[in-house]
Amino acid sequence: MTEYALLFVSILLVNNFVLVKFLGLCPFMGVSKKLETAIGMGMATTFVMTLGSMFSWLINEFILVPLDILYLRTMAFILVLAVVVQFSEMFVRKVSPELYRLLGIFLPLITTNCAVLGVVLLNINLSHGFLQSTIYGFGGAAGFSLVMVLFAAIRERLAVSDIPAPFRGSSIALITAGLMSLAFMGFTGLVKF
């Protein structure tokens, strides 16, 4: 049980996909201008990364490995993620049309989010079991969501701040992301996993 908790904390804080592995930077920068959009994108990404990790592990273990067609891993995983994203897109459209409108093109682009594909490929490369893959996917998604929501809250405050003209927009956003990354480096000694 402790191993699973350490895995979750490790991927959530210490090995965060956005701030440490630099995966998922496109939605991180693109959707984080408003807090409500970041929360919605975080929930959708959490759903996709968790289910994608589960289904990809099952497909790898019960189809790709037994049939010795490992060269189709990436293609199979992208297909699984596309199906999960389409399901989540239909769900968000039905439950919250306003959130669906706010997320716009970023919702279907979850399929090509490198953090989503990265968690699936890292699960296979790290030889995780089913439960570990699920925890790794959920922890990675929770870390992605946490960082995106924190970043969106900071960006909303920066939008009303008096920032010198050369630093407005993407410049201050990248500086802020760098400072967040430095802050998360403080968690490095927390988990030795």
Swiss-Prot record:
It holds the Pfam family Rnf-Nqr. The keyword Transmembrane helix applies. It is found in: Cell inner membrane. Its main location: membrane. GO terms for biological process: electron transport chain. It is a multi-pass membrane protein. GO terms for cellular component: plasma membrane. The chain crosses the membrane at residues 5-25, 39-59, 62-82, 102-122, 134-154, 171-191. Its EC number is 7.-.-.-. Keywords: Cell inner membrane, Cell membrane, Electron transport, Membrane, Translocase, Transmembrane, Transmembrane helix, Transport. It is an enzyme of class 7 (translocase). The complex is composed of six subunits: RnfA, RnfB, RnfC, RnfD, RnfE and RnfG. Part of a membrane-bound complex that couples electron transfer with translocation of ions across the membrane. Belongs to the NqrDE/RnfAE family. This is Ion-translocating oxidoreductase complex subunit A. The gene is rnfA.
